[in-house]
Amino acid sequence: MSDICDANKLKHRFRGYFPVVIDVETAGFNSQTDALLEIAVTLLKMDDEGMLGIDKTLHFHIEPFEGANLEPAALAFNGIDPNNPLRGAVSEKEAFLDIFKAVKKAQKAADCHRCIIVAHNAAFDHGFVSKAIERCDLKRSPFHPFATFDTATLAGLAIGHTVLAKACMMAGIPFDNKEAHSALYDTERTAELFCYIVNRWKQLGGWPLLAAGAQDAESDTEE
């Protein structure tokens, strides 16, 4: 099979987009005012059989930006103490420079033309990521400015449940609720869920699509 029509290559699976799984932990719901406190980024790879899997994960604790709002309820929910020196937190800019470097390298290796964020309830994560990039005045973001793959939506379609923990368990992916709301843990479970859905769709015959010409030929033969 030629590279041009090789459906088992990642660059052909999502129209040239390289999926990057992201989860953030924050000090509230407002991306403009509330601090980004933790981020994890999981890179994916596709094997020779066209099956998607986890490659590696980057993880950063983030220092609240100057003047950031810290909602007590949000901190109680995720258990993060922004002032704990043991967090080893770095600035938003330092984290995103490292993230940009890693995802651009992976995107190039996969011969894709742009990265697209995969997240559970993706609008939330995409909003905080985009705002942090804007605050840091970073240019040439690898991420699509508005398009995302939302695993809550995909799981609702493929599995019948939208809650991450429940969807994972229904897909046979172990999920420990005690570990939840850690960006590192949630990102890797989200990545496993996304890979499960993509791979299951392939196994069921949904991918690759038959070319229009092949479909027409089959129709002519049947007639």
UniProtKB/Swiss-Prot annotation:
Specify which residues bind Mg(2+) 1 according to the UniProt entry for this protein. Answer: 23
Can you provide one Gene Ontology molecular function annotated for this UniProt record? RNA exonuclease activity, producing 5'-phosphomonoesters
Would you indicate the residue range of the signal peptide?
none
EC number of the protein: 3.1.13.-
One GO CC term on file: cytosol
On cofactor binding, the record's note says: Binds two Mg(2+) per subunit. The active form of the enzyme binds two Mg(2+) ions in its active site. The first Mg(2+) forms only one salt bridge with the protein.
- EC top class named in words: hydrolase
> What is the protein name given in its UniProt record?
Ribonuclease T
What is the scientific name of the source organism?
Answer: Shewanella sp. (strain W3-18-1)
